[in-house]
């Protein structure tokens, strides 16, 4: 699953969860 989150600076960061 691919989720988009915001960093402390408000930057769009993507973390990939491999199931």
Swiss-Prot record:
Record localization: Secreted
Is Amino-acid biosynthesis among the key words of this record? no
Give a GO biological-process term.
adaptive immune response
Q: Which UniProt keywords apply?
A: Adaptive immunity, Blood coagulation, Coiled coil, Disulfide bond, Hemostasis, Immunity, Innate immunity, Secreted, Sulfation
Q: Chief localization class?
A: secreted
Q: How is it modified after translation?
A: Conversion of fibrinogen to fibrin is triggered by thrombin, which cleaves fibrinopeptides A and B from alpha and beta chains, and thus exposes the N-terminal polymerization sites responsible for the formation of the soft clot.
Q: Which residues carry this modification: Sulfotyrosine?
A: 4
One GO cellular component term, please give it: extracellular region
Does the entry feature the keyword Isomerase, yes or no?
A: no
**What is the stated purpose of this protein?**
Cleaved by the protease thrombin to yield monomers which, together with fibrinogen alpha (FGA) and fibrinogen gamma (FGG), polymerize to form an insoluble fibrin matrix. Fibrin has a major function in hemostasis as one of the primary components of blood clots. In addition, functions during the early stages of wound repair to stabilize the lesion and guide cell migration during re-epithelialization. Was originally thought to be essential for platelet aggregation, based on in vitro studies using anticoagulated blood.
Its quaternary organisation is:
Heterohexamer; disulfide linked. Contains 2 sets of 3 non-identical chains (alpha, beta and gamma). The 2 heterotrimers are in head to head conformation with the N-termini in a small central domain.
Domain comment, as recorded: A long coiled coil structure formed by 3 polypeptide chains connects the central nodule to the C-terminal domains (distal nodules). The long C-terminal ends of the alpha chains fold back, contributing a fourth strand to the coiled coil structure.
Protein name per Swiss-Prot or TrEMBL: Fibrinogen beta chain
């Amino acid at each position: 699953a691919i989720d988009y989150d915001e960093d402390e600076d408000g930057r769009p960061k993507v973390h990939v969860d491999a199931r």
